[in-house]
UniProtKB/Swiss-Prot annotation:
Region described as Disordered: spans on this chain: 18-48
GO biological process, one term: translation
Ribosomal protein is among the record's keywords: yes
UniProt keyword list: Chloroplast, Plastid, Ribonucleoprotein, Ribosomal protein
UniProt similarity note: Belongs to the bacterial ribosomal protein bL34 family.
Biased composition (Basic residues): 31-48
Cross-referenced HAMAP family: Ribosomal_bL34
Gene Ontology CC terms, in alphabetical order: chloroplast; ribonucleoprotein complex; ribosome
Top-level lineage group: Eukaryota
Name of the protein described by the UniProt record: Large ribosomal subunit protein bL34c
Principal location listed in the UniProt entry: plastid
Leader sequence residues: none
């Protein structure tokens, strides 16, 4: 069985990868946010 991607990371380092500001910093991240808004997700990204 393979390890999960962010299994041993601290909350801080996970947010640096997948928090709102880091998503909005790149075109692909903005696309991700747009798709999650379109789908009607309650949580767009991880919360602090």
């Amino acid at each position: 069985m393979t390890k999960r991607t962010l299994s041993n990371k601290s909350r801080y380092s996970v947010l640096k990868l997948s928090g709102f500001r880091s998503r909005m910093a790149t075109p692909q991240g903005r696309k991700t946010i747009r798709n999650r808004r379109k789908k009607g997700r309650k949580n767009l990204t991880l919360r602090r």
